[in-house]
């Protein structure tokens, strides 16, 4: 989950005939549930080539209330269970977004051999995305140039931009746009279940995929077996309310870094208290308001660079970086590389305006002054890490279409699953995961002291992987609240140690962030 303006992508929808099988389900959707899934070698560009991975398409109605109003194609991928005698069904996956391509998710579980023995792992591009029938959205220039500390007069620029995004997506999306939604994607998942001949599916969803999984379970409780919601959203809050949680998490990570650095004043010389360390950042930012300083071209670049404090393993190098600027040794090439690495590790723009359609399911304030007041508050108190942009109006502030339906109340009438969240994740903060776990009355795995987003099968976290695998394979849940140590570990720099003695912090910050960016690419 991250506020992004999706890139334009154009593709004509494809349509196929439906063929019945023995897995019939009565009703007007019978032909969709009983279609034959023709697995074959994946077309070039769908997924990274790998032995045993197949692809197919499933046909779904654009509008489930009026199935005669046109069809959409949903692209799916499969890695079959390696031990057919022990096979217990399919494991459907979603990477989040909204709008993330999930065909390649079948590769994420390659190291989880126990899971691969018993499940067919299924990836999918949700409706509107990638190799499925794409939603059209006319391209809009990026908002990357917007300042991190806008003047009052500049606040309206966000509204103008958001209006243009909404207008372009509405023109490009046409009738299909109203039907690209969490609820319809959940219905597509149930059609996939039926078409595969399964009575139930198990599920692993990340980020927004946790909301999708919770909605799927609410709409189709008899169809859901085991479920893992990793980096969960808060099912009781609107998208904008969760943006507030994101800003709070960014601020909390910054605070923790100042505490860590203050405890090592003898190493970095940035102050013996968190307030003193924060004052060093403020001093750099103040100089940047007047012009280039410390290698940075402007204060906006520096503000976003401070967002690196979410990653614990970057703390030592970031402290060293700030100390070098304080000493007058700022390097423009390093500063540019830091910003580039953070952008590379950020979430890719989601496909074809899907994000801009799905997020409009939530209620949004329509009075722009509500956003402007929040933007000014964060600009004046804590602008580091891009907080102001999270508070800005979005295209949904100016939504041009009427929602066909609201998100249903999240309920659980299916077997208990798992929620996984970390206490440093800024995209889906731990507070969101706590609410999801409490609302569903399921166990929560807290990944401690870790700023990464998405954990199971992605971070080589033996504790998380073992607990989730045990549940998925054997149905054994952990205690209601479990803590696993994170893998995003701050370097052990004892107080008083000279910075030059630190092996990791001797590496450039940009190099460390570049490694993190590669690891983060699933999102």
What are these regions, as identified by a protein language model?
Residues 2-9, 20-152, 275-277, 402-403, ...:
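Catalytic-loop region of hydrolases
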Residues 27, 276-414, 442, 457-459, ...:
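Alpha/beta-hydrolase fold active-site neighborhood
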Residues 134, 140-195:
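Active-site-proximal cap/loop segments of hydrolase catalytic domains
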Residues 136-147, 217-276, 308, 320-333, ...:
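A catalytic-pocket lid/entrance helix-loop region that shapes and gates access to the active site
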Residues 197-208:
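Alpha/beta-hydrolase fold nucleophile elbow
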Residues 413, 418-421:
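Short beta-strand/loop motif that positions the catalytic acidic residue
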Residues 426-431:
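Conserved alpha/beta-hydrolase "acid-adjacent" motif
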Residues 451-462:
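Catalytic histidine-centered segment of alpha/beta-hydrolase-like enzymes
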């Amino acid at each position: 989950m991250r506020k992004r303006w999706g890139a334009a992508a154009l593709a004509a929808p494809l349509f196929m005939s439906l063929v019945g099988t023995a897995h019939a389900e009565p009703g007007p959707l019978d032909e969709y549930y009983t279609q034959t899934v023709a697995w074959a070698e994946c077309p070039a560009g769908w997924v990274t080539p790998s032995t045993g991975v197949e692809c197919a398409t499933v046909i779904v109605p654009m509008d489930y209330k009026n199935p005669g109003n046109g069809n959409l194609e949903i692209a799916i991928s499969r890695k079959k269970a390696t031990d057919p005698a022990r096979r217990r069904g399919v494991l459907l996956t979603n990477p989040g977004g909204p709008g993330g391509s999930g065909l390649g998710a079948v590769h994420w579980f390659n190291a989880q051999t126990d899971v691969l023995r018993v499940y067919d792992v299924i990836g999918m591009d949700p409706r509107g995305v990638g190799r499925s029938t794409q939603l059209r959205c006319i391209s809009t220039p990026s908002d990357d140039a917007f300042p991190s500390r806008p003047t009052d007069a500049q606040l309206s620029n966000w509204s103008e931009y958001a209006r243009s995004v909404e207008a372009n997506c509405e023109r490009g999306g046409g009738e299909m746009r109203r039907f690209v939604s969490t609820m319809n994607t959940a219905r597509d998942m149930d059609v996939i279940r039926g078409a595969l001949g399964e009575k139930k599916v198990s599920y692993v969803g990340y980020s927004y995929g946790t909301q999708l999984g919770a909605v799927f379970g609410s709409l189709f409780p008899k169809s859901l077996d085991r479920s893992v919601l990793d980096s969960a959203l808060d099912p009781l809050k609107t998208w904008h309310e969760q943006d507030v949680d994101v800003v709070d998490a960014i601020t909390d990570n910054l605070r923790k870094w100042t505490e860590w650095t203050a405890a090592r004043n003898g190493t970095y010389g940035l102050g013996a208290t968190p307030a003193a360390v924060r004052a060093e950042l403020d001093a750099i930012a103040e100089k940047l308001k007047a012009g280039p300083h410390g290698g940075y071209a402007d204060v906006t670049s520096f503000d976003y660079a401070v967002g690196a404090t979410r990653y614990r393993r970057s703390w030592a190098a970031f402290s060293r970086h700030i100390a070098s600027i304080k000493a007058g040794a700022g390097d423009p090439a390093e500063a540019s590389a830091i910003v580039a690495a953070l952008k590379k590790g950020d979430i890719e723009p989601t496909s074809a305006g899907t994000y801009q359609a799905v997020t409009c399911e939530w209620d949004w304030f329509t009075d722009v002054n509500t956003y402007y007041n929040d933007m000014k508050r964060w600009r004046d108190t804590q602008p580091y890490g891009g907080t102001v942009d999270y508070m800005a109006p979005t295209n949904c502030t100016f939504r041009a279409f009427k929602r066909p339906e609201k998100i249903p109340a999240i309920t659980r009438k299916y077997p208990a699953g798992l929620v996984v969240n970390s206490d440093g994740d800024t995209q889906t903060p731990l507070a969101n995961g706590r609410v999801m776990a409490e609302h569903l009355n399921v166990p929560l795995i807290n990944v401690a002291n870790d700023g990464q987003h998405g954990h199971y099968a992605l971070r080589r976290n033996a504790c998380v992987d073992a607990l989730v695998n045990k549940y998925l394979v054997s149905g054994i849940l952990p205690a209601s609240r479990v803590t696993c140590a994170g893998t995003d570990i701050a370097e052990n720099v004892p107080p008083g140690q000279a910075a030059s003695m630190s092996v990791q912090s001797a590496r450039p910050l940009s190099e460390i962030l570049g490694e993190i960016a590669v690891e983060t690419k699933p999102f």
